[in-house]
Amino acid sequence: MKIIAFNGSPRGPRSNTHAIVAPFLEGAQTAGAETENVFLAGHDIRHCRGCYVCWIKTPGRCIIEDDMAGLLGKMAAADVIVFATPLYVDNVSGIMKQFLDRLIPAADPHFHKDENGECKHIPREGMLASKRFVIISNCGFAEVSHFQVLRLYFRRMARNISCRVVGEIYRTEGELFPLKMPGLSPILDAYRDRVRAAGRELVETGAISEETSARLEEPLIPEALYIGGANRWWDKNIAECGA
């Protein structure tokens, strides 16, 4: 199995998103998968122009000369694609959205009806058709309900290009990852172990079970403790900056 992860955080390898992606890929590797981790912030990805050249004049090929053609090639060669992003304004990061907008060369412009009678695009052969997606996201909020829009967004996107979501990892209290606190270290280590197990499960079974996803969504620390600590952190830093 070949797995490629696309990290849409502007912080790249220093991101809280990477703190989840890294152990996930490690777990997949121990089960025999070949993995690659791509930081989108390090690539030249320009916005879609909406010109439809990739649908009409050069089917399957974008007119923009940047890094997207190579990234699409990597996606086409993978069995599983991991979309990893921090939660920004209830959705994906701007970097990730720009990347996703540029996936339209992978679809044929013609419509057809799915099994529920809803229009979708015909997938272009040899690109993304029938790929499996894993979604990884983290946020600074305390409740998992904040991922409702993002969760639906990726499921709808997968449906429209004839792919399917086979695993989801949504992590609240994400700002705990960079903290260096003795009492917190074993909690984060245990969480990373569970993420590694999810990576192994994906390779061994082809998916991440709902039970595994639910366990990974459990709070790292009590919500009241997290919210209080976060507010004190902001107060301290705002005061130090003289605001």
Question: Residues of each region from the PLM?
Answer:
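Beta-strand-loop-alpha "switch" segments that mediate conformational coupling across diverse proteins
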Residues: 166-174
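A short acidic, helix-capping loop that chelates divalent metal ions and anchors anionic groups
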Residues: 176-180
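Short, histidine-centered active-site or binding-site loop motifs used for metal coordination
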Residues: 7-10, 137-140, 173
